[in-house]
Amino acid sequence: MKVIIIALVVAFAIRYFLISPVTVYGDSMDPTLHDGEHLFINKLSTPKRFDIIVFPAPDEKGAEYIKRVIGLPGDKVEYKKDTLYINGKKYDEPYLEGEKEKVANGYLTNNFKLEDLPAVKNAKVVPKNHLFVLGDNRRISKDSRYIGFISEDDVIGKVISFGSSLKR
């Protein structure tokens, strides 16, 4: 009996304080993550650039968003001709390459500078203790371009596992 209680306590602690399952709702992270896909998040991990994170939707009570971290505190983020620049340095986004090829006219990600986005209130850099996030499906994603910066304190967890092996 004692072993069962210890096992339950350990399972509870892991589930609520370390690793938690989440489900993708919507298409904003296509082609990387798909609607209905099941994921695991690490609740203790500190997000790094290009990590996929989960956070409470600031504009939908009770909902959660899953997005990719693009900008870290102090970063200047800009898109020019479908190319990401952070602090003036060009970054490749291999997770988008197949999607960029499908765009017949225009760009997958429209040109922008942080200070041109109304949602970030003319900020030139990502503020301290905040993140700039984008969905991989740039044409439909409701992300930092529209909802503003995400507080690091609001991050529920970092995605640590996804793929067909987790689909039900």
Regions found by a protein language model. Give the residues of each.
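Soluble "head" domains of membrane/secretory-pathway proteins
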Residues: 13, 17, 35-168
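Short hydrophobic/aromatic segments of transmembrane alpha-helices and their interfaces
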Residues: 1-2, 30, 138
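Alpha-helical transmembrane signal-anchor/signal-peptide segments
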Residues: 22-35
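Hydrophobic membrane-insertion alpha-helices, especially the h-region
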Residues: 2-17
